[in-house]
């Protein structure tokens, strides 16, 4: 039984392998390859060739928008969309200080806390509204590989978004 499953898996991978490569399109061996469906705002995989400098950005949380709001409420940081924009702007600044940009992001991990206004469910749509302003756009078409997960909480009450990224930059 296990041999049959392994044989089927191998056949499937061999059959789908060329399709995945075709989606990535031709790329020079020394260029980053972003693989995935063209209509998707995220890459299924990103291949970074040897020789690139990697920048690892720790989990970044949103800035306080309203210091007069009651402590521990989302109004301290805004809704999920607002928090996502604030976090990505912070990441953008960190990357720019290192000579990189959001176009260099190859991997992203998004942690979302459930929104009390949504019955404790993560606001994936709100996060995507913020995300789509920066990635897979006409001005910045590069898409990172990404994971989005709901977590129980972050470091401060009212925070609903934390994002960690890895960026790859070709040395001069």
Which residues does each PLM region occupy?
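N-terminal secretory signal peptides that target proteins for export/translocation
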Residues: 1-7
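N-terminal presequence-like segments and the immediate start of the first folded domain
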Residues: 8-89, 93-109, 115-172
């Amino acid at each position: 039984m296990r041999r049959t499953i392994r044989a089927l898996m191998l056949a499937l991978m061999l059959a789908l392998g060329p399709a995945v490569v075709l989606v990535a399109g031709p790329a020079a061996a020394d260029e980053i390859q972003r693989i995935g469906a063209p209509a998707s705002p995220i890459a299924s995989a990103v291949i970074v060739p040897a020789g690139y400098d990697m920048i690892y950005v720790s989990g970044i949380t949103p800035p306080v928008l309203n210091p007069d709001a009651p402590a521990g409420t989302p109004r301290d940081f805004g809704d999920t969309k607002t928090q996502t924009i604030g976090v990505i702007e912070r990441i953008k600044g960190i990357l720019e200080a290192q000579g990189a940009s959001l176009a260099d992001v190859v991997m992203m991990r998004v942690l979302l806390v459930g929104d009390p206004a949504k019955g404790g469910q993560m606001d994936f749509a709100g996060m995507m509204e913020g995300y789509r302003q920066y990635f897979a756009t006409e001005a910045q078409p590069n898409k990172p590989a990404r994971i989005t997960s709901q977590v129980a909480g972050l470091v401060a009450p009212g925070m609903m978004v934390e994002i960690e990224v890895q960026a790859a930059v070709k040395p001069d």
